[in-house]
C-alpha cells in the first residue's frame, strides 16, 4: 500500500543556481549538499536536486506537468511580489473561476513548472460539482 510521497527529485543543470532558488526564493530548508546533489525540506516534502548538465530540457516547456504548493489567500500578494522581486519566470496562468481559488505558475531555473495555489482538493471538487455537469464523480 502506498503511504505518501517520499520525495521529489529534479534534474538541474546548475546546482548552485537551483540551491539559490529553492533556499533563498522559495525559503526551503537546505539539509545537505554534495558535489552534484542537494536536499531540502520544503512544505513538509523532501526535495532532491541532482545536477545533470548534459540532458535535453526543451520538452519541459510544452507540458502542463507541475508541482503545486499550498499557500494561504492572505499570502498570495506577498508570494507574487517575492517571485517578481527575484526575477522568477512567472507564467501566464489559465483563466479561473473565483471558486477555483488563486494560483501563481512559475518555473525554477531549469524550467520545472511550479504553482502556488490557495485552494484545496475539496474546493476544486465542490466547484466542479457546481459548474461542470459533464464530469463524473466517484465516492
Curated annotation (Swiss-Prot):
This is Metallothiol transferase FosB. GO terms for molecular function: magnesium ion binding; transferase activity, transferring alkyl or aryl (other than methyl) groups. The active site is at 115 (proton donor/acceptor). Belongs to the fosfomycin resistance protein family. FosB subfamily. It comes from the Bacteria. GO terms for cellular component: cytoplasm. The keyword Magnesium applies. It is found in: Cytoplasm. InterPro entries: Fosfomycin_Res_Enzymes, Glyas_Bleomycin-R_OHBP_Dase, Glyas_Fos-R_dOase_dom, Metallothiol_Trafse_FosB, VOC. Its main location: cytoplasm. Metallothiol transferase which confers resistance to fosfomycin by catalyzing the addition of a thiol cofactor to fosfomycin. L-cysteine is probably the physiological thiol donor. Its cofactor is Mg(2+). Keywords: Antibiotic resistance, Cytoplasm, Magnesium, Metal-binding, Transferase. Gene3D superfamilies: 2,3-Dihydroxybiphenyl 1,2-Dioxygenase, domain 1. The keyword Magnesium applies. GO terms for biological process: response to antibiotic. Homodimer. Residues 4-119 form the VOC domain. Signal peptide: none annotated. Its EC number is 2.5.1.-. HAMAP family: FosB. Mg(2+) binds at residues 7, 66, 115.
Amino acid at each position: 500500500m502506498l503511504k505518501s510521497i517520499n520525495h521529489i527529485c529534479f534534474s538541474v543543470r546548475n546546482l548552485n543556481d537551483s540551491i539559490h532558488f529553492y533556499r533563498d526564493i522559495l525559503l526551503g530548508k537546505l539539509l545537505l549538499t554534495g558535489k552534484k546533489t542537494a536536499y531540502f525540506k520544503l512544505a513538509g516534502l523532501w526535495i532532491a536536486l541532482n545536477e545533470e548538465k548534459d540532458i535535453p530540457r526543451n520538452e519541459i516547456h510544452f507540458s502542463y506537468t507541475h508541482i503545486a504548493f499550498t499557500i494561504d489567500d492572505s499570502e498570495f500578494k506577498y508570494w507574487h511580489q517575492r517571485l517578481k522581486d527575484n526575477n522568477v519566470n512567472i507564467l501566464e496562468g489559465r483563466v479561473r473561476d473565483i471558486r477555483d481559488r488563486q494560483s501563481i505558475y512559475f518555473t525554477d531555473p531549469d524550467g520545472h513548472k511550479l504553482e502556488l495555489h490557495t485552494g484545496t482538493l475539496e474546493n476544486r471538487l465542490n466547484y466542479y460539482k457546481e459548474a461542470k455537469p459533464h464530469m463524473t464523480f466517484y465516492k
